Curated annotation (Swiss-Prot):
One of its GO terms (biological process) is nuclear-transcribed mRNA catabolic process, nonsense-mediated decay. ATP-dependent RNA helicase involved nonsense-mediated mRNA decay and ribosome biogenesis through rRNA processing. GO terms for molecular function: ATP binding; ATP hydrolysis activity; G-quadruplex DNA binding; G-quadruplex RNA binding; mRNA binding; RNA helicase activity; snoRNA binding. Keywords: ATP-binding, Cytoplasm, Helicase, Hydrolase, Nonsense-mediated mRNA decay, Nucleotide-binding, Nucleus, Ribosome biogenesis, RNA-binding, rRNA processing. This is ATP-dependent RNA helicase DBP2.
Length: 530
């Protein structure tokens, strides 16, 4: 899949499914994306859709594999039960168990096999037949479960079945995501698996110059991955349109609503023909997401992996220390000393505010720890650089706010430290879920203070379900219910369990690109530790 941002477009895509190239029955052709001379904005209004006059399009590409068709209802129920899979809706296709059973065209299957995946994930086993069948669907699964490929590969098949883009046409596939980091990661997957089809894509998000994004849209792209706010900017400026969109994805729908994007989502979806295929993906299923699905999905089918009851992964060791605010820094350093016993470990530290994020980063660097900060006040170029340094291990400690960390998928995070507790238990589970992925083990350390008392009951419930050791201070708090006052002192509990001693990160390199660094990321790095 060609990615304009990487400058590797080599020409138009091939038609794997055929179709009529003379696509001139009402889409596109709006005289280009130039907008007016002064880039005046035009308020978006909901089109009066006449489905009879809209060009027809194909969205059902699924043919059940003979091996899948031969399985008994008992076998299917056993498979779903084994993978904690539950489905809702009518005429739900049976799950597949291998890549070959999915029914992908050979050009897609070859891309998948080239990546060396042993087998589909649970969400892919059920999600692919659903998506390929053209149905509106809801997928509920944890972050890191393989949901991106669950909609990305069917999107490639969908695009190749549609007529080629004409000048002035907008995208065929639109993916909405809550953050620029997640949008970029989705784009990377789309580029990786669509290379043989020469499908073009671009990422449209805030915090970056509009010029390159506008040029990408003007050249024509089959896939747009966007954050809601920046996409509305482009639509109101006349730089793109959604008339060709027949495959819509809402990724991390719960997070988008948490971040207040519901009005923008509704405004965008109203610009898309109502007979499109819509796929909604979410880690949770709150009423707000249900209402959005009810308004925009037609006769949807749903697959859920795991229970709707909020739970933390059992591969994560949860350590909670009940301490005071002034003890946090000393405790943080002690845990970093423990974390460095694993040579190539990565540590993700969460802070509640941008100010705290910078203060912790500056403190750690002055103490000799190779830490970098990422939050919303950083320019996109610096955020990208920090993320690269963290992923490669050149800076193995990253301090982040919740918003900056949403959508970031980094492999090999061994430790998560909640320097500040989040405001709700859902964010706690989401934070600590950055470690212990894919069956690996991980450790999550949380500093619980008097200001976090409202979380006490829910935190005990999460830890108890995961069979974790609850420190006595937290147990006392749980018995007194919400709002109880905690007297600090005595043992902290939960500190053991993953070893002690100090190792090393193998040098202090990786800080050459100083032009990216601002604020706390420019704080001098002491040689005290390494």
């Amino acid at each position: 899949m060609n990615n304009y941002n990487n400058g590797d477009y080599k020409g138009g895509r091939e038609q794997h499914f055929g179709g009529n190239n003379n696509y001139n029955r009402g889409y596109g052709g709006n005289g280009g994306f130039g907008g007016n001379r002064y880039n005046e904005r035009v308020e978006l209004t909901t089109p009066d859709w006449d489905l009879e006059s809209l060009p027809k399009f194909e969205k059902n590409f699924y043919t059940e594999h003979p091996d899948v068709a031969a399985r008994s209802d008992k076998d299917i129920a056993a498979f779903r039960n084994e993978h904690q899979m539950s489905c809702l809706g009518s005429d739900i296709p049976h799950p597949i168990t291998t890549f070959d059973e999915a029914g992908f065209p050979e050009y897609v299957l070859n891309e998948v096999k080239a990546q060396g995946f042993p087998s589909p994930t649970a969400i892919q086993c059920q999600g692919w037949p659903m998506a390929l069948s053209g149905r509106d669907m809801v997928g509920i699964a944890a972050t890191g479960s393989g949901k991106t490929l669950s909609y990305c590969l069917p999107a490639i098949v969908h695009i190749n079945a549609q007529p080629l883009l004409s000048p002035g046409d907008g995208p065929v596939v639109l993916v909405l995501a809550p953050t620029r980091e997640l949008a970029v990661q989705i784009q990377q997957e789309c580029s990786k698996f669509g290379s043989s089809s020469r499908i073009r894509n671009t990422c449209v998000y805030g915090g970056a110059p509009k010029g390159q994004q506008i040029r990408d849209l003007a050249r024509g792209v089959e896939i747009v991955i966007a954050t809601p706010g920046r996409l509305i900017d482009m639509l109101e400026m006349g730089k793109t349109n959604l008339k060709r969109v027949t495959y819509l994805v809402l990724d991390e729908a719960d997070r988008m609503l948490d971040m207040g994007f519901e009005p923008q989502i509704r405004k965008i979806v109203d610009q898309i023909r109502p007979d499109r295929q819509t796929l909604m993906w979410s880690a949770t299923w709150p009423k707000e997401v249900q209402n959005l699905a009810r308004d925009y999905l037609q006769d949807p089918i749903q697959v859920r992996i795991g229970s709707l009851e909020l739970a933390a992964s059992h591969t994560i060791t949860q350590v909670v220390e009940v301490i005071s605010e002034y003890e946090k820094r000393d405790r943080l350093v002690k845990h970093l000393e423990t974390a460095t016993t694993e040579k190539e470990s990565k540590v993700l530290i969460f802070a509640s505010t941008k100010k705290t994020c910078d203060e912790v980063t500056s403190y750690l660097r002055a103490d000799g720890w190779p830490a970098l900060a990422i939050h919303g006040d950083k320019q996109q170029s610096e955020r990208d650089w920090v993320l690269r340094e963290f992923k490669t291990g050149k800076s193995p400690i990253m301090v982040a706010t919740d918003v900056a960390a949403r959508g970031i998928d980094v492999k090999g995070i061994n430790f998560v430290i909640n320097f500040d507790m989040p405001g709700n238990i859902e964010d706690y589970v989401h934070r600590i879920g950055r470690t212990g992925r894919g069956g690996a083990t991980g450790t999550a350390v949380s500093f619980f203070t008097d200001g976090n008392n409202k979380l006490g009951g829910d935190l005990c419930k999460i830890m108890r379900e995961a069979k974790q050791t609850i420190p006595p201070e937290l147990q006392r708090f749980d018995r007194k219910s919400f709002g109880a006052h905690i007297r600090y002192g005595g043992g902290r509990g939960g500190r053991g369990g993953y070893g002690r001693g100090r190792g090393g990160y193998g040098g202090r390199g990786g800080y050459g690109q100083r032009n990216y660094q601002t604020g706390s990321n420019q704080a001098p790095l002491s040689n005290r530790r390494f």
